Amino acid sequence: MTAAGDFASLSDGETFLLLAALVAVIGSILVTTLRTGVPPMPSTSHVAATMLALVPADTRGVIYELGAGWGGFAVRLAWRGPAARVIAYELSPLPFIVAKALQWLSRCRNLEVRYGNFMSRPLGDGAVVTCYLMIGAMVRLAPKLRAELPAGSLVVSNAFTLPDWPPERVVTVTAYQNTPVYLYRQPLAAQEASATPVG
């Protein structure tokens, strides 16, 4: 029997439950997207590979993946940097559940997928931050990273810039629509300025 035949054989109650579940899933993603301004879109394989190459494989400490989506990139980060602790944040319920399942299936001991808004979480122990966010989220994130990240920390961003923060390097992924990947480094001066008493 074909898939269409299987669907046609469902009772009215089963069809209603299936459609209700589908609407709930789509609604959940839509509500979270409207709330955060960031849909759960995965990075393409070419862009993800470029981002990974900008993260030192010998990174120690914490790597934050902000807006983990479905979790695929977070797993790759954990595989690439076994000496690091990868903490991935996701706020959309369904992608979070999938990412959490992927964490379990990958058996990466150095990966932790967390449900929550990274804007309300401290990031001051981050050695590296990776993100694929939209413009509005980057505007809100930039001052938080400036204020919290230790000197020398790296930020790797897919496609979107951090306002008023010149990148150390920009890599254009020609294999996918000339997508830019930005590498930022937290300058020592920013930390010194925040630690210097005024008056």
Regions found by a protein language model. Give the residues of each.
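S-adenosyl-L-methionine
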Residues: 1-58
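Glycine-rich SAM-binding Motif I of class I
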Residues: 71-75
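Conserved SAM-binding strand-loop segment of SAM-dependent methyltransferases
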Residues: 107-118
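Conserved class I S-adenosyl-L-methionine
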Residues: 59-69
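C-terminal substrate-binding/active-site "lid" region of AdoMet-derived donor-dependent transferases
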Residues: 137-198
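Conserved SAM-binding loop
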Residues: 99-100
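A short SAM/SAH-binding and catalytic strip from SAM-dependent methyltransferases
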Residues: 124-140
